[in-house]
Curated annotation (Swiss-Prot):
The keyword ATP-binding applies. PANTHER family: URIDINE KINASE (PTHR10285). It comes from Sodalis glossinidius (strain morsitans). SUPFAM superfamilies: P-loop containing nucleoside triphosphate hydrolases. ATP binds at residues 95-102. This is Pantothenate kinase.
């Protein structure tokens, strides 16, 4: 039996990396080194050790929660005398820009789909529900992209509601980081998966975050289990700048890239612009709209240098 680190009363159980890793409990690692390379983000050093010590215990925990949810559904069907319909289990992943949400989402998708039950696991990012650039420009919101007011929150809530209601076929808009915009006439089809992983800055936000567009139902109302990927802001800013520099040498060099003009910058100029973008946009959004949602999460992954998770907090 693994005991959590003793601390003052808190809604969370707290684990060191070593304690959390021990909860893997012989779950086999089904990903190869080559597959892990394909899953990691541009700015991360995702290792087999990280997957084994952090994500395998998490996938085991999620498997328990999902199995419990299925048993609850079976009890309800028995009570009602119905066969019922497949209701997807929704996992939400939130956190700052550059913290590694996408990598966490992709690793969990790969691991959860390989459990013996062979569950169907879909992944959708909330980026697709940003208003198109044409709308953001019209509303003078291009410099607030990722802030609550930049999302078509009603469409996002409608999408998640349909998925959670068991609608056989639901579509989600697709976002391209190359063109920095929603892709016109392109959609991702979601057809009653066993699990939907929803990843985005705004997954845990609620009414107080949308004063500009008051409504009564939010994405978080439909999420069964939520994860917040956390790190000190000094690290987040550093990771953001490093990622910007890598994009400058890679994706930004594509003539079709929205940020192609940044590819001509010197390293010093690129660092200055990335620092400015962080302080004016991403850092502000973190402090005002993202970090305040952290304590709403079911589980918090606390990262240190090199994107390594060093502590885990699990809601009691």
């Amino acid at each position: 039996m693994i005991k959590a680190v003793q601390s003052p009363p808190t809604p969370y159980l707290q684990f060191s990396r070593k304690q959390w890793a021990a909860l893997r409990n012989s779950v086999p690692l089904t990903l190869t080194e080559a597959e892990i390379v394909n899953l990691k983000g541009i700015n991360e050093d995702l290792s087999l050790e990280e997957v084994a010590e952090i994500y395998l215990p998490l996938s085991r925990l999620l498997n328990f929660y999902i199995s419990s949810n299925l048993r609850r559904q079976a009890v309800l069907e028995q009570f009602l005398g119905t066969d019922g319909q497949r209701i997807p289990y929704i996992i939400g992943i939130a956190g700052s820009v550059a913290v590694g949400k996408s990598t966490t989402a992709r690793v969990l998708q790969a691991l959860l789909s390989r459990w013996p039950e062979h569950r169907t696991v879909e992944l959708v990012t909330t980026d697709g529900f940003l208003h198109p650039n044409s709308v953001l420009k019209q509303r003078d919101l291009m410099k607030k992209k990722g802030f609550p007011e930049s999302y078509d929150i009603r469409s996002l809530v409608n999408f998640v509601s349909k998925v959670k209601s068991g609608t056989p076929r639901v579509t989600a808009p697709v976002y391209s980081h190359l063109i920095y915009d929603v892709v016109p006439d392109e959609q991702k089809v979601i057809s009653q998966p066993d699990i939907l992983i929803l990843e985005g800055l705004n997954v845990l936000q609620s009414g107080s975050d949308y004063n500009h567009d008051p409504h009564h139902v939010f994405v978080s109302d439909f999420v069964d289990f939520s994860i917040y990927v956390d790190a000190p802001e000094t690290l987040l800013q550093s990771w953001y700048i490093n990622r910007f520099l890598k994009f400058r040498q890679g994706a930004f060099s594509d003539p079709d890239s929205y940020f192609h003009h940044y590819s001509q910058l010197s390293e010093q100029e690129a660092v200055a612009i990335a620092s400015q973008l962080w302080s004016e946009i991403n850092g502000r959004n973190l402090q005002q709209n993202i970090l305040p949602t952290r304590e709403r999460a079911s589980l918090i992954l606390g990262k240190s240098a090199n994107h390594a998770v060093e502590r885990v907090r699990l809601r009691k």
